[in-house]
Swiss-Prot record:
Naturally occurring in which organism (per UniProt): Methylacidiphilum infernorum (isolate V4)
Catalytic site: 392 (nucleophile), 421 (proton donor)
Keywords from the UniProt entry: Carbohydrate metabolism, Glycosyltransferase, Transferase
UniProt keyword Protein transport present: no
Marked site (Transition state stabilizer) residue numbers: 479
Family, per entry: Belongs to the glycosyl hydrolase 13 family. GlgE subfamily.
HAMAP family: GlgE
Protein name listed in UniProt: Alpha-1,4-glucan:maltose-1-phosphate maltosyltransferase
Transferase keyword on record: yes
Chain residues that bind alpha-maltose 1-phosphate: 261, 321, 356, 393, 534-535
Length: 667
């Protein structure tokens, strides 16, 4: 038919393939962009799905949810419960790692509608002979669809002319027949949801993890010498004691010699300069090789196993870029852009230039071979025992590539996790998460005011973002010494650590710069560290005076003891009269043990009144209640809703309260 549209004609037909199908499945939720992208969950959770399903008129409908793991051929179907207003709900357990597929199926329940009509007629002594014949016809349709022999036997009995009308009616009223029909419905005119709902089910570390980043080359037992994996094994007990369960290593590959950067990112390197680990590749190897000064592949595997002995996983940095002397440039020149003068195009982000890094050309005609090779890098390191990858600058590679490669890896290695390091525009940042990244760096690093933190957390913990984006909060990185940490006292480092570790269930620090409170920038107005470890070997005194290792260990210990801190979305902000005091509750419904956190966001002593409603966490508001500060091991007694707080950052910049009343912790 012709449809006028803003002055021009559009041809459109709304003729369905089968107009007899009357069910409408209008919405399934939760979903990401109308099920274009997978939801994120962890193993052991219960997946709750709702849908709007209805039909014209007043007839009863049946709605089922079907689900399966993609490794399984068979679907499991469960009935959905009607909640009212044409909303339906069902839930099922997520028992396997990997990818689940979900669809909704609906149909008119003609037999149930007929049965209700029959009961009404029988109650009013109406003639039901014709209605019984109609019912038998409906049962025959059910049998034609399901081919259930048991249902066929019931139909034959109902058609037995030796039975009286009353006897047939009693057979029809038998609850077992109704149950049998429900198991064998006539779904010849059923409707399925147009797009399947996919769910990435990951292991619990996708939801709760504590990351510690360090440069292995800086940990030789001889100051100034290049460290090795063997020497780094001595760090593991202290890292574990601080409460970290992921050790993240910057790239461990050979570093290019051409255009190598010197100290503080100098354009000209001296012969002694070690270069940036992100300038990957030399004559000694590329992305599947280990820098010879770090040790051998066997040394690396031993380091991974040793870390596991302390409950720590090793995460590797995957940076899909090359130095100018990476073997790929000779072996696959088509994977790079070449300038008219015959030189390769190095990386640029004007006005910044990265002469020591050459990006891949993802528009190459040989793109499929490039994609397969990059996938093989993940597989290679998975085979060395690595199951967590921090991906460098994924926003500079096509999103279609990430969707493909993460799906491929997740299908074959479902326990693999991916952290996206993309400090970029919000839609691009979220777009990467939608395509499968388990966790993502965030803008937390630049949120310094209480109002900014509140607004940002509300964004991250609200639909639709909460369904696909898992934040990982980092107060610092080798590239970023945020302004509020520059020249800051240890109390500010403690404050940012408490925020990162209690706002988000996933967080990380770059150490030992963080716990040693390194606070000197390259120059005023810059976020880079002075004498950045990216470009030189450092010698660290890990136990130097003023370090906050014990404080970090205490916070991480509290995180492990209290499930409320092992989720991100379960946050509720509390109002107060001082904008420099940030207060919030973390709780898991049904688990008890809610926590109240109050953080001083300034460098000065702050005080104010907090409006906390004790009944919101199950406490009796008519009685006093106790708050035990898990950081200071001090207990306070509060009364009612408004209570006074004073925080001296030099003593401790935060309260982390556990709530109790009459000697019992909050239910």
């Amino acid at each position: 038919m012709k449809m006028p549209s803003f002055g021009y004609e559009v041809e459109k037909s709304f003729l369905p393939v089968d107009g007899r199908k009357r069910i409408v499945i209008e919405r399934i939720f939760p979903s990401v962009d109308c099920s274009d992208f997978p939801l994120k969950r962890v193993i052991g959770q219960t997946m709750v799905v709702r849908a709007y399903v209805f039909a014209d008129g007043h007839e009863r409908i049946s709605v089922h949810l079907a689900y399966r793991h993609i490794a399984d051929s068979q679907w499991t179907e469960i009935s959905m419960e009607e909640l009212g207003n044409d909303e339906w709900e069902a839930s099922f357990p997520l028992e396997k790692l990997g990818i689940y597929e979900v669809k909704i199926i609906g149909w008119i329940d003609h037999f149930q509608n007929w049965l209700e009509k029959l009961h009404k007629l029988a109650e009013n002594d109406k003639d039901i002979a014709v209605e019984l014949s109609i019912g038998i016809g409906l049962l025959e349709k059910n049998w034609a669809f399901s081919r259930s022999q048991e249902l066929k036997d019931w139909i034959d009995r109902l058609k037995d002319e030796r039975l009286s009308l009353h006897q047939r009616l009693q057979l029809i009223k038998n609850p077992y027949l109704e149950e049998l029909v429900q198991k064998n419905p006539d779904r010849s005119l059923s409707v399925e949801s147009e797009s399947p709902l996919f769910i990435f089910v990951e292991r619990s570390k996708a939801q709760f993890s504590s990351w510690y980043e360090f440069f292995p080359r800086s940990w030789s037992s001889v100051p100034g010498k290049h460290g090795t994996f063997k020497e780094c094994e001595r760090l593991l007990p202290d890292i574990a004691a601080m409460g970290f369960d992921v050790v993240y290593l910057p790239p461990i590959h050979p570093i290019g010699k051409k255009a190598r950067k010197g100290k503080n990112n100098a354009l000209i390197a001296s012969p002694e300069d070690v270069g940036s680990p992100w300038a990957i590749g030399s004559a000694e190897g590329g992305h599947k090789s280990i820098h010879p000064s770090l040790g051998s592949l066997e040394d690396f595997r031993h380091f991974v196993k040793k870390a596991a002995d302390y409950g720590i996983e090793v995460a590797l940095d995957i940076a899909f870029q090359c130095s100018p002397d990476h073997p790929y440039l000779l072996e696959h020149p088509a994977w790079f852009k070449w300038r008219p003068d015959g030189t390769v195009q190095y990386a640029e982000n004007p006005p910044k230039k990265y002469e020591d890094i050459v990006p891949f050309d993802f528009e190459t005609e040989d793109w499929q071979a490039l994609w397969e090779e990059l996938k093989s890098i993940f597989v290679f390191w998975i085979n060395q025992g690595v199951k967590i990858f921090r991906v460098d600058n994924p926003h500079t590679k096509p999103l279609a590539f990430w969707r493909w490669v993460i799906w491929e890896i997740k299908r074959d290695y479902p326990d693999t996790l991916f952290l996206s390091e993309a400090f970029t525009r919000p839609k691009l940042l979220y777009g990467l998460a939608k395509r499968g990244f388990s966790q993502s760096y965030t803008y937390f690093t630049w949120r310094s005011e209480a109002s900014e933190i509140k607004a940002y957390m509300e964004e991250l913990t609200s639909p639709p973002v909460v369904e696909f984006f898992r934040p990982n909060f980092w107060p610092n990185t080798p590239d970023i010494l945020a302004g509020y940490l520059q020249y800051a006292p240890p109390s500010v480092f403690k404050m940012r650590h408490v925020l990162a570790a209690t706002l988000s269930s996933n967080y990380g620090i770059y150490g030992p710069a963080f716990e040693l409170c390194v606070n000197i920038p390259l120059e005023p107005g810059k976020e880079e560290y002075k004498d950045s470890e990216k470009y030189e070997i450092k010698t660290w005194d890990w136990n130097a005076p003023g370090n906050i290792k014990e404080f970090i260990a205490k916070v991480n210990h509290i995180r492990k003891l209290h499930p409320a801190l092992q989720r991100t979305e379960n946050i509720r902000f509390i109002q107060g009269d001082n904008p420099r005091l940030l207060a919030y509750v973390k709780e898991l419904p049904g688990h008890g043990d809610p926590l109240l956190i109050v953080v001083n966001m300034s460098r000065n002593t702050e005080m104010g009144w907090i409006h906390f409603q004790p009944e919101s966490v199950g406490l009796d508001p008519s009685k006093p209640y106790q708050l035990t500060d898990l950081l200071a091991d001090v207990t306070y007694t509060w009364h009612g809703e408004w209570n006074f707080v004073k925080l001296d950052p030099e003593a401790c910049p935060a309260h982390l309260f556990q709530l109790s009343q009459d000697g019992s912790f909050s239910p």
